[in-house]
Amino acid sequence: MGEIDMNEDVYVLGIETSCDETAAAVVKNGKEIVSNVVASQMESHRRFGGVVPEIASRHHVEQITLVIEEAMQRAGVSFSNLDAVAVTAGPGLVGALLVGVNAAKALAFAHGLPLVGVHHIAGHIYANQLVAEMKFPLLALVVSGGHTELIYMEEHGKFTVIGETRDDAAGEAYDKVARALGLPYPGGPHIDRLAHEGEPVIDLPRAWLEEGSYDFSFSGLKSAVLNTLHNAKQRGEEIDPKHMAASFQESVVDVLVTKTVQAAKQYRVRQVLLAGGVAANRGLRSALQDKMKELPGVELVIPPLSLCTDNAAMIAAAGTVLYWQGKRSDLALNANPGLPLV
């Protein structure tokens, strides 16, 4: 089922609680946001330098009902107007996922609505459907805290992972380097900001891996940054964090963008999508826009910042496609922290 054309309006409530955002949204026809509510827990986790699963779960329990009520209220719809409830079933933190899954199951049961379990990464990809029509075949570069993947799609709901990280995800590397530079959590936005003030004058490695591979590796780069900082400290030298941020970011972005464009050429895609939390990175967005000039016939879609980070509108969008395809979950749906995409 490639191109989807539905004449009747479909309203789907999306619920997302995979990490540290409690989110709910109502989306019409898989592409029009009617409401989109996100309650972030960033302040609660900042002092720990990362997401604490137990704290995340407790916050989700406190927020979930309020967030869903607000999404329904802002959308001006009642449960009788909905066609389905879509929820992130995985991957993510198991305790966090369970809050959303249980809320979705309760609502689906109480209101007699179909339940649709959604893969979190499929959600990130379908965030792009909220800003542009998806054209197949396409290639999605998914870059987030836990994932760095190149995904080829021939049609709706059909995913082929052609490249993935062999060690650290790009977002993980950002957070670890940010910590080494003494920057607050989450590290990505801080490194991105600093990188624009500095120059990439420090020589850092780029892991291209073997010929023809679209996989990624960032642990060597992360180690090189930590070693460079450590050695400078031992010598009593000062390394300007701005220049280190610029050098690190250039190394990450160069590999991501080059491999994406190479894969887009090889797979002869019509469209390239950027997705995931790190897609909010200005350096990555502008470098990909520049590099895509090599492929004048291929459309590049980059979602607005609000749709890059975790949200429920993307889950509702992906859930609508599954709903149209007749795919449903039953009330035995469980949270799966290691849920595979394919």
UniProtKB/Swiss-Prot annotation:
Protein residues bound to Fe cation: H120, H124, D310
Cofactor: Fe(2+)
InterPro entries assigned to the protein according to its UniProt record, in alphabetical order: ATPase_NBD, Gcp-like_dom, KAE1/TsaD, Peptidase_M22_CS, TsaD
Annotated GO CC locations: cytoplasm
Cofactor stoichiometry and binding remark: Binds 1 Fe(2+) ion per subunit.
GO aspect biological process, one term: tRNA threonylcarbamoyladenosine modification
Residues involved in substrate binding: V142, V143, S144, G145, G146, D175, G188, D192, N281
Stretches of the chain forming a coiled coil according to its record: none
Keyword line: Acyltransferase, Cytoplasm, Iron, Metal-binding, Transferase, tRNA processing
Main location: cytoplasm
Gene3D superfamilies: 3.30.420.40
Xref: CDD domains: ASKHA_NBD_TsaD_bac
PROSITE patterns found in the cross-reference section: GLYCOPROTEASE
Pfam families assigned: TsaD (PF00814)
Subcellular location: Cytoplasm
EC number(s) given by UniProt: 2.3.1.234
GO MF annotation, one: iron ion binding
Keyword Calcium: no
Similarity annotation: Belongs to the KAE1 / TsaD family.
Functional summary from the UniProt entry: Required for the formation of a threonylcarbamoyl group on adenosine at position 37 (t(6)A37) in tRNAs that read codons beginning with adenine. Is involved in the transfer of the threonylcarbamoyl moiety of threonylcarbamoyl-AMP (TC-AMP) to the N6 group of A37, together with TsaE and TsaB. TsaD likely plays a direct catalytic role in this reaction.
NCBIfam families: gcp_kae1 (TIGR00329), T6A_TsaD_YgjD (TIGR03723)
The name this protein goes by in its record: tRNA N6-adenosine threonylcarbamoyltransferase
